[in-house]
Amino acid sequence: MPPYRSRTTTHGRNMAGARGLWRATGMKDEDFGKPIIAVANSFTQFVPGHVHLKDLGQLVAREIEAAGGVAKEFNTIAVDDGIAMGHGGMLYSLPSRDLIADSVEYMVNAHCADAIVCISNCDKITPGMLMAAMRLNIPVVFVSGGPMEAGKVTVKGKIRALDLVDAMVVAADDSYSDEEVEAIEKAACPTCGSCSGMFTANSMNCLTEALGLSLPGNGSVLATHADREALFKEAGRVVVDLCQRWYEQEDATALPRGIATRAAFENAMSLDIAMGGSTNTVLHLLAAAHEGGIDFSMADIDRLSRHVPCLSKVAPAKSDVHMEDVHRAGGVMAILGELERGGLIDASQPTVHAPTMGEALARWDIGRTNSQIAHEFFKAAPGGKPTQVAFSQAARWEELDLDRENGVIRSVEHPFSKDGGLAVLFGNLAPEGCIVKTAGVDESILTFRGTARVFESQDAAVSGILGGQVKAGEVVVIRYEGPKGGPGMQEMLYPTTYLKSKGLGAACALVTDGRFSGGTSGLSIGHVSPEAGEGGLIALVETGDPILIDIPTRGITLEVSDAVLAARREAQLARGKDAWTPLNRKRDLTPALRAYAAMTTNAARGAVRDVSQIERG
């Protein structure tokens, strides 16, 4: 049997010094034979999705210790993408994912912890912790802070549900008065929790359920609801059980790589496609699979996207539906249940809470279980009062949303669309692929031919859109914003938001080697690979060039002759050391960002680190 890792620091005469230090943290003689379990928290007062996590690490710790373990808490950083959006702060968002993964590895390996409970929530924190979990391959349970309640506001005589993106859209819409914009701003984010739509944070927290690494409801129980407390407590108990199964019984299904297998990653991607998740999830699933040594690529995502239907549309794809509505319809377990009935997932995969996903669905899918516990659990509703306090309300819906024909979650027989909510496009403009969230694209522009309007940065694009340079029928091309070229692969939420506010949301396309916020909708195509900064064809596009986007055939083509492109490439190479860098863009980069750019890879590889790029030959 594998020895407990922690015994490296707790056993033997030569570890007297280490034990002395452990004792100074509160450990006693009887603790030195117990598993030491790291509680990786991500509390910060900068991020509404994390502002309520301060005491939750100790809540988990108490359950770990009651179950026979020793809990030791530490914190990672957390960047708020919404606050970092639209300025130089966004350069740090994606790099923070790697920093979070490394920080978890550093703490866990430096102190020889036996297992981890990952308390995550927002955009890069769950992916960073997931990468660390797959890299370390020791027992782990994920529990997130939970979604924010949707805002409610009365504007122009109508009550409407809203979220962060609504505030951004109306701020650039001159038809709204300053007073109306202020009212929406104040109502958009009423509580603690991750932003209320199917944006990146909530998408990733849903995907940990599909991977089998978190408990049912992790992706959908509101941060404010009393029911969420049970998830934190159960996580503490489950991780001790996983420890015992691995270290005392050598049960490999207690490990992340034994649970989050290739089949589980396919399950997670199928869920993502079915629920129209954020395009960022593609980036993060590729990275997590890479850390676990799992062969999972854009080709696999393309294959899945061609036969998994769209079973749910949530904001931003459907502005009046939010995570609280998904939960009422049965949450992730209900979507997985519909996919399983359609033969679209492998339900034989293990989870941290059940021997197989199939057994978990039998208990938690409200479409097949009569369990009063499950039905009551998914009736957890918003409290409707602004708060930053976790578990502070216990409201219930009077009834569940069990309508699989017209409800928030549909059956395979009654999908929103037969094609899923995400698609991978290939073509000369993106030989290694690019991503579009089809759930947010108007059917009238699924095939779109337009002329390029090229910008060398997000800032330039924003100025061009707001300044009236962009016209209907154009393809806005924003380049040199990839992982290397940015660096940091900024989110393009402001350009897409401003296109929408200018009435161009269904009249223009946007193509970039950067990425998009989970709040993006419209014909927004990101992750173009290879990126401009590594010599990708997107660097050769000129304003006026015709571009064909054909989602039904999964194609994206720059309609310029090979001879013209070859001449442009020669001209680019003639720039010498300045080749494949933007013109007329000055961006001061710190050593931290330059180091990230030197080691990162393109989006088709998940923007993972490849140190061979800087190693001596």
UniProtKB/Swiss-Prot annotation:
- Enumerate the Gene3D superfamilies for this protein: IlvD/EDD C-terminal domain-like
For whether the record's keyword set contains Transferase, the answer is no
Pfam families listed in its UniProt record? ILV_EDD_C, ILVD_EDD_N
- Sites binding [2Fe-2S] cluster sit at C122, C195
Listed GO CC annotations: cytosol
Gene that this polypeptide is encoded by: ilvD
Q: Which positions in this protein are listed as binding Mg(2+)?
A: D81, D123, K124, E491
What is this protein identified as? Dihydroxy-acid dehydratase
> HAMAP family, alphabetically?
IlvD
